[in-house]
A protein has these predicted regions:
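General structural signal for alpha-helix termini and helix-helix connectors
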Residues: 28-32, 70, 142
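Short acidic, glycine/proline-rich loop/turn micro-motifs
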Residues: 105-107
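Unchanged
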Residues: 109-133, 141-197, 206-214
Length: 214
């Protein structure tokens, strides 16, 4: 769940870090709880996290408690994969139906996937191109320069080689197109792709440099 900018009441949200950490402690604690007392205490921590978020946003605390209840097991950051695929020096982007913004194709990695297999599948599903992942361009903290979200996530951007295929939108994407560096659309799907990721992708295409990481 994304926290829209108009939901934020302060510029530097220490409260978001606190709420995330409390929720992570709660989720992990519930996973290892050995008795009803521990379960109740860790459930209360989840409620406190929801109350913090509800106080600083227009999100409903009760809805957040339900969302948190669906998160089970040891709490870790989520993994988002993105494929930077080029044709004649232009970058493949897809337009998201959900917000109308452009992004490199990708999505959450599924359990059981190799990271490379995840990004190759996402590019095929969202854009219609069979690709092979060749290199990790960067590993980013997804919220460092993007919209704030409740759950912490890492973003892995791969340099991919197009093997075959033609542009083909999906139920998630409305358009598929290639853009030179100077033609990149101004309206990006910010929680998925940022200008930083696009810049690094073009650099990786032209230069042999080490993987970038936060």
């Amino acid at each position: 769940m994304k926290l829209n900018h108009d939901q934020l009441e302060i510029d530097f949200p220490h409260w978001l870090n606190w709420a995330r950490e409390i929720q992570a402690i709660s989720q992990t604690g519930l996973h290892f709880a050995e008795n009803d007392y521990q379960t109740q205490r860790f459930q209360r921590l989840s409620e406190i996290s929801a109350e913090i978020l509800g106080n600083y946003t227009n999100l409903d605390s009760a809805d957040l408690v339900e969302i948190f209840a669906d998160q089970i097991g040891y709490a870790t950051p989520r993994i988002d994969v993105r494929g930077a695929a080029f044709r004649d020096g232009s970058l493949l982007l897809v337009r998201e139906r959900i917000d109308g913004g452009w992004t490199m194709p990708g999505g959450w990695a599924d359990v059981g996937d190799f990271p490379s297999a995840a990004v190759e599948r996402e590019v095929l599903e969202e854009a219609g191109f069979k690709v092979e992942a060749r290199k990790v361009i960067g590993i980013y903290d997804a919220n460092r320069t993007g919209p704030l979200e409740i759950f912490h996530a890492f973003k892995i951007v791969f340099l991919c080689e197009i093997i075959s295929g033609e542009p083909r939108p999906s139920f998630e994407t409305s358009e598929v197109a290639f853009f030179s560096h100077d033609e990149i659309p101004q309206v990006l799907s910010g929680e998925r792709t940022r200008q930083r990721h696009i810049h690094d992708a073009f650099v990786a295409l032209s230069e042999d440099r080490p993987t970038i990481f936060d």
